[in-house]
Each structure stands twice: as structure tokens, then as C-alpha cells.
Amino acid sequence: YKGIRITLDGLKKAKEEGFAFKMIFVGDGADKSEMEKYAKELGLEKECIFPGAIRDRELLRRYFCAADMFLFPSTFDTNGIVVREAAACGLPSVLVKGSCAAEGTTHLQNAYLIEENADSMAEAVRFSCREEEAVKNMGGAAMEELYISWEESVRRAVDRYGVVIDNYKKGNTERDRIWTDPFFAMMAEIQTRMNAAYAV
């Protein structure tokens, strides 16, 4: 559940209160035409743009850099890599409190956390329109605190595999059926060979 209806309902409330904005919904999917229709029903056809999927990374980066906030009220996504992509462009995200995507974020420091409803989303939009300097500062904090480079992601993954492999070698496992999996046995063998190569 991506929270697109909550977003649209919140935008309608903000528009009715006189706030001016543009919202770009990047992405494709089975519900895209239904969401476009719903935006029109709400009278948001001038405010909402639906360009579809964008595969050009540079174009996507430009969309991020042109925005004030990244509205991502998803309660479905488990990682929220797009939150890190937005942070890489100095863009704070609007996230649902307690969602996986909001993990590691702090309200009004590097993100804007909302309840899962249209009123809370409308308040986030109002905040974005009223508090430009605060939003900019939150974006800077998001870049500093949330962005993780691919190199760092790989380093962390390798470190985690190292722990798994060490546990396998020592027999320190609580879930033996997982650690006896051929994949982990192979990884342990590769690590042993690498350690031997570095020891020479």
C-alpha cells in the first residue's frame, strides 16, 4: 500500500485552504490510470503530474532536486531505498510514523513523520509551503544522516556476511538448518580462501 489516495486527499485539503503546489507522481503500475482519474475527480488535474516510470537516472535526479519534499506514505515497502535516494539529493521525505520506510528517521530533523491519514498529509504539505528554510535544513540533515553510498552499502553487506560466516565456522548458530544451507557453506569456504590469500 503506497498511500497514494491519502496523498491525493491531503493535497485536496491543502488546495482548499489556498496553498499552491505541484505534485509529481513518478512511477507506473496497474493503479496509475485510476489514480489519475481520482486526482481529476478531486479537482487536482492542474496540480498533479503523472509522467509514469522514469528509467533515466539523471532525469529522476533532476526531479528529486527540483522538489521541496518527497511524499512517500507507504506502509508496504520494507526498505525505502527511495528515501535514501531522495536524501542523496538533499530532499527530506514525508513518511508514515512506525513504517519500515521511516526507520532511522527523526521528525523535523531529517524527515516529516505523519499519521496514516489525509489530515496529517495536508499538514505536511502546509508545512512544506510555509517553512521553506526548515524544509531545506531537513534536506541537508537527510543528506548527512540518511544517505548511504553504494560503496558503504556493499561494505556493510560484506561485514554482515563475515559475521554469518564466522558463526557458521564456530558452530555458534541458533538456526542450524539455515547455516547448513550449501550457500552459507560455500561463502564460508570462499572467506577461508580469501583469508589464506591475504595471510601470504
Question: Model regions: which residues?
Answer:
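Conserved acidic donor-binding segment of nucleotide-sugar-dependent glycosyltransferases
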Residues: 107-108, 112-118, 127-132
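C-terminal amphipathic helix plus adjacent low-complexity
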Residues: 153-200
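Aromatic "clamp/platform" in nucleotide-sugar-dependent glycosyltransferases that forms part
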Residues: 75
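A short, well-ordered alpha-helix in the C-terminal region of glycosyltransferases
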Residues: 134-148
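A conserved mid-protein helix/loop that constitutes part of the nucleotide-sugar donor-binding site
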Residues: 1-13, 19, 23, 30-36
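Short alpha-helical donor nucleotide-sugar binding micro-motif in glycosyltransferases
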Residues: 53, 61-67
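Short hydrophobic beta-strand element within catalytic cores of glycosyltransferases
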Residues: 92-96
